[in-house]
């Protein structure tokens, strides 16, 4: 199975003409993140048959030199956003791994699908592309991974991500849930939740290579 087949199935089910129109106009007249060629990087860097973990984000960062198509990731050399800083703090506490770049391309190459629920945003306007059609697309992506793949770990941080839990077949996948790593909620159960070691324990138990959470590749 390839992402192209999945995309084809989704486009058979939904008409994205309206969304395509909105995006066409937005990219022509506004600053939109990520750059157009980076919108689908999550799928480019993590082929369908390599997906071992899915981490769901909300929408892309809306500042310059941040979003590049992977949830939570920022371009190398960019200051770490607060949620990502907390993710790294938990990684260090959990597995004693220190990372030196905010770019998560290495995770993507390891088999971690870093999927935002909405894949584009207008610069400086959080959630500006909510409701234009991306949610249908990402819902179908989660369903497809659940349906066609085996023993995938779905990491759902925060209420919006956890709304997708009902789409996941828990008889053949693992779901890890906690509050969001945002500074607003991290101390209410994200810190100490050990999502990285939990993920690797599950993968090893199902004869899969664990994720190298310290891997750093630059796009």
From Swiss-Prot:
Keywords: Cytoplasm, DNA damage, DNA repair, Hydrolase. One of its GO terms (cellular component) is cytoplasm. One of its GO terms (biological process) is base-excision repair, AP site formation via deaminated base removal. It catalyses: Hydrolyzes single-stranded DNA or mismatched double-stranded DNA and polynucleotides, releasing free uracil. The keyword Hydrolase applies. Its main location: cytoplasm. The active site is at residue 59. InterPro entries: UDG_fam1, Ura-DNA_Glyclase_AS, Uracil-DNA_glycosylase-like, Uracil-DNA_glycosylase-like_sf. GO terms for molecular function: uracil DNA N-glycosylase activity. Its EC number is 3.2.2.27. Gene3D superfamilies: Uracil-DNA glycosylase-like domain (3.40.470.10). Pfam families: UDG. Disulfide bonds: none annotated. It is an enzyme of class 3 (hydrolase). It is found in: Cytoplasm. Excises uracil residues from the DNA which can arise as a result of misincorporation of dUMP residues by DNA polymerase or due to deamination of cytosine. HAMAP family: UDG (MF_00148). PANTHER family: URACIL-DNA GLYCOSYLASE (PTHR11264:SF0). Belongs to the uracil-DNA glycosylase (UDG) superfamily. UNG family. This is Uracil-DNA glycosylase. The lineage of its organism: Bacteria, Bacillati, Bacillota, Bacilli, Bacillales.
């Amino acid at each position: 199975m390839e992402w192209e087949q999945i995309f084809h199935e989704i486009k058979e089910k939904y008409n994205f003409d309206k969304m395509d129109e909105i995006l066409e106009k937005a990219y022509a007249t506004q600053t939109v993140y990520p750059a157009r060629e980076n919108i689908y990087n999550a799928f480019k860097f993590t082929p369908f048959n390599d997906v071992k973990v899915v981490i769901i984000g909300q929408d892309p960062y809306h500042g310059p030199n941040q979003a590049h198509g992977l949830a939570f990731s920022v371009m190398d050399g960019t200051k770490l956003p607060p949620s990502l800083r907390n993710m790294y703090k938990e990684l260090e506490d959990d597995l004693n791994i220190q990372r030196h770049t905010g770019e998560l391309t290495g995770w993507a190459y390891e088999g971690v699908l870093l999927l935002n629920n909405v894949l584009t945003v207008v610069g400086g306007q959080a959630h500006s592309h909510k409701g234009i059609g991306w949610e249908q697309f990402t819902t179908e992506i989660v369903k497809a991974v659940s349906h066609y793949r085996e023993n995938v770990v779905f990491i759902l941080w925060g209420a919006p991500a956890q709304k997708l839990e009902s789409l996941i077949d828990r008889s053949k996948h693992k779901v890890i849930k906690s509050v969001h790593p945002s500074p607003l909620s991290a101390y209410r159960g994200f810190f100490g939740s050990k999502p990285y070691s939990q993920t690797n324990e599950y993968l090893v138990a199902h004869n899969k290579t664990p994720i190298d959470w310290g891997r750093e590749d630059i796009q």
